[in-house]
Amino acid sequence: MDSTGELLFTILSSLAQDESRSISENCQWGIRSLFKQGVVHINTNRFYGYDKDEDGRLVINPEQAKVVRWIFESYMDGINPDIIARRLMEQGVPGCMGEPKWTVDTIMGILQNEKHMGDAILQKTFTADYLTKKQVKNEGQLAQYHVKDDHEAIVSKELWDVVQLEIQRRKDYMKRNGLRTMGRNTDEQPFTNRVFCGVCGQLFWRRTLYRLNGSIKAWMCASRCKGKKVKGCINDTLLEADLHKAFVMAWNAMLENREDFLEHWKAQLNDQNPLVAFRAKQFMKLTEKAKPMKELDVTIVSKTLDHCEIKPLGVIDFYFLDGSHIGLVTGD
């Protein structure tokens, strides 16, 4: 190509680019004008729980809505997102694309999507580059518009608000204790990342102890074994059987003294923090006609326990999600 051809090509490319930018800006202006008017435009292909009617309005997909409600309820029962995702896949529940593929991000996206409570926040993302069409998260660069009661809700606003508070509580818990997750396989090991040392404050780890007559599970302070010639934490090792027994004792003590706790819960029902009121109602329901626990109930641990502290001489302090504290001594 000679110099004249190259010049012509450059001019035409520039014109095409200007045209592309002009079209992009016009489209964005039109969309933002609709946003200002509160007109909601949502692609339901990747939006779980809703379909669209002939007029483009969001309508509930009954089968998907059942799954959404179950996800919200499970989360407030103390089930972590990875467990929720695994159970949905095990049951073969179709995701938004029709296949049983669920991830932690998918679950968290459903829990944090305000559209499930009937509202819509417009312009969460925007096109940063008209050439690449790359979408970026709107973190204050452009105005956002909150449309309330735009469509029928799948979950109540009260439940949605409580879930957001619980999400933040778990984030704060992990940050405060230096954790990356709330624990894996917590549906089988509910004490994971919930047991702390009452001497040095470190996390207790679950370990296998080998003896002549076999092996047993036990919990010990993470800072106990620091290496040769380095003195670790002096706290005792706790057999898992004793930890389970201690929780059963603590829970049964709550049931036995329910009337005393009831005054505490009733007062919390009017708390300005919706999560506090939710927990009070939850504990009242769990203990209403409950029979004494004979062996560890994993679901009760997941629903009720915030954390526990292990201290020397078999002392264990249990801290529950309603703010209650029960201390006891294990062993003979």
Model-derived features with residue positions:
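Phosphate-interacting basic helix/loop segments used at nucleotide- and nucleic-acid interfaces
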Residues: P292-M293, T299-T304
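Non-catalytic DNA-recognition/assembly elements of restriction-modification systems
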Residues: K289
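Conserved catalytic breakage-reunion loop centered on the nucleophilic residue
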Residues: M1-L286, L296, H307-D332
